[in-house]
Amino acid sequence: MKLYAPYGSEGFNLYIDGVMDSIAKRFEKLFSRDELSALVLGGGYGRGEGGVLHLADGTEKLYNDLDFFVISKQTNPWKNSQISLKLKHLHHELSDEYGVEVDFSACMPINSLDKLPPYLIWYDPINGYQVIWGNKHALHTVPRWEANDLEPVEAVKLLLNRGMGLYFSRKYLSLEKPEPHLDFINRNIHKAYQAMTEAILIVEGQYHWSVKERMRLISIPDIGKYLSNPAFLDLAQAGMDFKLKPYLPTESPEELKERLSQTLIDFEELYYAVWAAFFGVSNLNLDTYHRLLASYKDSENSLMSLAKNFALNLRDIGLSPGSLNEYIKYPRYRLFYALPWLLFDAPISLSNLAPILGLAHGADAESLRQRYVSLWQRYN
């Protein structure tokens, strides 16, 4: 029996085995081995560290997303678009069937895997995965990186995505009836502390693919360099524990609002501390953050990368007066620029935000928030 969830029963792990078999059979019907090489389960379940939700009646349920990497043969763009369309339909079918998000990556050509850069999205799965369909050796050419190969930019990318979970949590808590969203809010508070832990370990060169090992390693660095909250280590441990043993919250909306408020305070402090480490300065304020961000150049600066960035920015915001430097950065730069306003209520004028996010001068705050979310969904 394969181990997917360490705190799940033998029956639960056998159930997930059956889910994998079922998905593999769907794949076999939909795709030819001439076009796709392998379907690989990553994420917590792929590493053998998936979560199990124990309900009051003794039932065990999937809780984490099922994250799959799709490894393709060398195919033309038209064929890839056809595959992507099938995967999109399959995502919706399987997510509805199993009650969790079943996500498929974009197709990754097998002959490009040896050239992958050390991104966090690949660091974890290459250290723990399961091929459920196709070539069992499909990932053998992916480089085996060390923790210090992960650049600090991986930490700030992670914080951007987890920050959006906090943004949506705050939005849900402002609703007249937030009760249907309490699980989402509790989950994203824990995920924020997971991300803060992981960001510190990345910057310190001590990141590890295993959740259990990260729980041990986070006690080693001088946390005071990043956060002043003396309870952070306990919150970090609780966040990591939640990854393995999730639960449904019993707190009231008001109690969750109080937890979220403290989480945002910690997250803001950590966010700027990680960026300070990224830029090699002792501390940051908003003005310094924006100035250094404006002068930052992407590490991927080949002529092809710069041309691609220019085309993406041109599509998103059109051609407007400003620095060429803004157009040749990957568009995620615009999200970093505006995140302190969106998440921390930083005093950035709407007239400055509008051109950054590709809206006309005079755009109101709600339009800017909606625009930010749409850009984040595009570049997440």
Question: Residues of each region from the PLM?
Answer:
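Active-site nucleotide-donor binding segment shared across nucleotidyl transfer reactions
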Residues: 24-66, 72-75
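Conserved NTP/Mg2+-binding pocket subregion across the NTase superfamily
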Residues: 3-15, 82-204, 210-234, 244-315
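Non-catalytic terminal regions of proteins
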Residues: 275-380
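A generic structural motif
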Residues: 72-78, 199-200
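Short catalytic/ligand-binding loop motif for oxyanion handling, primarily in non-cytosolic enzymes
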Residues: 48-50, 78-79, 113-116
